[in-house]
Design a protein with these regions (language model features):
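A structured binding-face within diverse protein domains that lines the active/interaction site
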Residues: 1-127
Length: 127
């Protein structure tokens, strides 16, 4: 099943299960970080980790939107995220977001995991 590109073409091919995203358009979600939570629990809570993009104050999360709702795209984890989770959200630096919207870059490059060193990780809880 594929997701229709912003220009009406079938640009994005995703294995998206039973949901139908035909007619969806691409979107960008601005963020300055995201969290992952890991076991074992400490005082009944999982350990909280903050991921930020190295050398950037913010980044884009790639998404799709349909009928007023959006979904963030995920991919296999890159080396920075793999120790904490079995997948990661798809990220782009601030200057690359336009390529997601205008389909000017190869889909496989856009949906690739972040390379080693692209993200910084900091434990938030417990301190």
């Amino acid at each position: 099943m594929g997701v229709e590109g912003a220009d009406g073409t079938a640009g994005l091919q995703l294995p998206i299960g039973r949901a139908t995203f035909a007619g969806s358009t691409r979107c960008l979600i601005p963020a300055d970080g995201f969290y992952e939570f890991t076991e074992p629990k400490v005082q009944g809570k999982k350990t909280k980790w903050l991921f930020t993009m190295a050398g950037q104050p913010w980044f884009w999360i790639l998404g799709i939107v349909k009928d007023g709702a959006f979904a963030m795209l995920t991919t296999e984890p890159g080396p920075d995220v793999a120790p904490y989770h079995d997948r990661q959200i798809v990220l782009l630096p601030p200057d690359a977001g336009v390529h997601w919207l205008d389909l000017s870059a190869a889909q496989d490059l856009m949906l690739a995991p972040s390379p080693a060193g692209a993200l910084t990780v900091r434990r938030i809880w417990p301190e």
